[in-house]
Amino acid sequence: MTLHLQAAGLACERDWRLLFEQLDFELGAGDMLQISGPNGSGKTSLLRLLAGLMQPTAGQILLGGKPLAEQRHALASILLWIGHAAGIKDLLTAEENLTWLCALHQPASREAIWAALEAVGLRGFEDVPCHTLSAGQQRRVALARLHLACPPLWILDEPFTALDKQGVAQLEAHLAAHCEQGGTVVLTTHHTLERKPSGYRELNLGQWAA
């Protein structure tokens, strides 16, 4: 399907507090949307809404012109979600984690998994239990999924967390390349992006912050 994600009159309330309202935007192939704003402004909540993990207080999200809530299967087939936490199992190795994560959507070969780990600078760590890795290395294990056979829509919550300078530069380049190849990225980050695709834009939720 051709990716077309639309937010119409979107509002979100958490703990009796309005985070944002009347949000309208559209996303398609090649777009990158950076969601910014102070802590507590609803950045993660907006990501979760777009990923179908929450329901809006008002308004709606459309996928291909149809309500997102009616298209769970279609969304799952095009979405890669990586939350703020690495989301990996400490007792599994880096390879085992990626094998398990990929099996939930599209299984990947051992060769592909090793290549993905090499792409994020973890060559030689394939058989290392993740509880022995640093926070940055654990984050890179999670981000290695972006180098496997991936769906077009990436929704990423603070993907640069715990990465060193080289890791940040590599991830920036990979996200931009994904968009330039027709993919779509929605992300939150406090990091100032140095490399932005032509379809980049920013949505600041700060105007609703108390």
Curated annotation (Swiss-Prot):
Identify this protein by name: Cytochrome c biogenesis ATP-binding export protein CcmA
Q: What is its EC number?
A: 7.6.2.5
- Source species: Pseudomonas putida (strain GB-1)
InterPro entries noted in UniProt: AAA+_ATPase, ABC_transporter-like_ATP-bd, ABC_transptr_haem_export_CcmA, P-loop_NTPase
Its GO biological process annotations read: cytochrome complex assembly
Which cellular components does GO assign to this protein? Answer: plasma membrane
> What residues does the ABC transporter domain cover?
3-205
Bilayer disposition of the protein:
Peripheral membrane protein
**Major localisation:** membrane
Q: Which reactions fall under this protein's catalytic activity?
A: heme b(in) + ATP + H2O = heme b(out) + ADP + phosphate + H(+)
Q: Does the keyword Cell inner membrane apply?
A: yes
Which compartments is it annotated to reside in?
A: Cell inner membrane
Subunit structure, per the record? The complex is composed of two ATP-binding proteins (CcmA) and two transmembrane proteins (CcmB).
User: Which purpose does this protein serve, as stated in its record?
Assistant: Part of the ABC transporter complex CcmAB involved in the biogenesis of c-type cytochromes; once thought to export heme, this seems not to be the case, but its exact role is uncertain. Responsible for energy coupling to the transport system.
Q: Which SUPFAM superfamilies match?
A: P-loop containing nucleoside triphosphate hydrolases
Q: Which GO terms describe its molecular function?
A: ABC-type heme transporter activity; ATP binding; ATP hydrolysis activity
Leading EC class: translocase
Enumerate the UniProt keywords alphabetically: ATP-binding, Cell inner membrane, Cell membrane, Cytochrome c-type biogenesis, Membrane, Nucleotide-binding, Translocase, Transport
UniProt-annotated binding residues for ATP:
G37, P38, N39, G40, S41, G42, K43, T44
UniProt-listed Gene3D superfamilies: P-loop containing nucleotide triphosphate hydrolases
Q: Which Pfam families match?
A: ABC_tran
By sequence similarity, the record places it as follows: Belongs to the ABC transporter superfamily. CcmA exporter (TC 3.A.1.107) family.
CDD domains reported for this sequence: ABC_CcmA_heme_exporter (cd03231)
The opening ranks of the lineage are: Bacteria, Pseudomonadati, Pseudomonadota, Gammaproteobacteria, Pseudomonadales
